[in-house]
Amino acid sequence: LYAPDVPVIGGGLFTKEYAEEHRAELERVYSMLADEKSKQVFDGWLEYRITGRIHPLLRNQTDKAEGYEILDLGGNETYADLGAYNGDTITEFLEVTGGQFNKIFAMEPDGKNYSKMKRIHYKLSPYDFRTVNAGAWSCDTVCEFISKGGRNSSLIPYEKGKPVNPSRIKEIEMRSLDSFVKDERITYIKYDVEGSESEA
């Protein structure tokens, strides 16, 4: 089974030649890994990126519980969920921390998803659970957005060249994480920011 790796943003493919050109950076990242499991996962990821074979990813697969175990989240986390969708990862976070946390900051640009998230987590205090119907960016601005009311909503550049229903294009507020959280110290961040990966 092959699953070629294609970039979500920007151009260029991750090939053997690319890996050779960036050998120093890749070796630097590898040297920062603290344990053998992390190094094994990195090697598998690198093999997948170059070959397109999915097996190197599958042999390093773990369940979500192990990931949360590694993160070692406690009851005093300040969590930023950028691209919060309907609040599904907020629900996971609350399960992992036993409902204990300092604050949660959630950004979601799609209006329907944002409403679902607010409805699902209506019991959380507005002081502890701060939300904004906006996308993540490097500064506060406005961008064009394709609203699809699901996981496929994205910024316009992500869809370039594909036919788009003009009624789905909306101008949306974009916020920087710093302007949204002010002086809060974030201890855990989740990014799922379709089309604004390099800017967020």
Give each language-model segment a name.
Residues 1-200:
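Phosphate/nucleotide-binding beta-alpha loop and adjacent structural elements of enzyme active sites
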